[in-house]
Amino acid sequence: GYPSQAQGMGGRQVRNGKDHGEIFDHHFVEFTYDSGAVIASQCRHQPGCMRRVDETLQGSQGCVNTKTGKLTDLEGNEIYKYKSDMLNEPNPYQVEHDKLFASIRNGGVIADAENGAKSTLTAIMGRMATYSGKVITWDQAMNSDMQIMPESLDWDSNPPTMPNSNGSYTIPTPGVTEF
């Protein structure tokens, strides 16, 4: 399933010049599911810092980190670690493409549009939460009139956010920015 709500924080500390548009350079989002499960997602785009883009699933008996492939108990003891054999395992991106191309050749259908759209909305909901500083529900994100796409998709289209006369962009401010 998909999260029922998101809350988070983020900001611009390093990438704050006119050449960086409106984007934050770090985000931390907690996605909460109807079951009560919470997934913590974080990213940072700051030169000279540890770069981290991953998700952590915290349960009542332990924790899973998607980047390390480790499952630990509540005391941090390793219960399981995915053992990768990088030399003999196929590249997952290549496997995905192989399946897609085989499906096309054989007249099959891989119907991932709904999953792709809902996964994208999940990411947008997280960004809405960090930019606004508010808890954003799935329904609020789904029904929002926020426009992040150009009005038309052609080579002459402008993005929905343009710089002002000084070349600066309006930067989202948590607690002020609406979604």
Place the predicted regions along the sequence by residue.
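Contiguous beta-strand/loop segments that form the cofactor/metal-binding neighborhood of enzyme cores
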Residues: 1-179
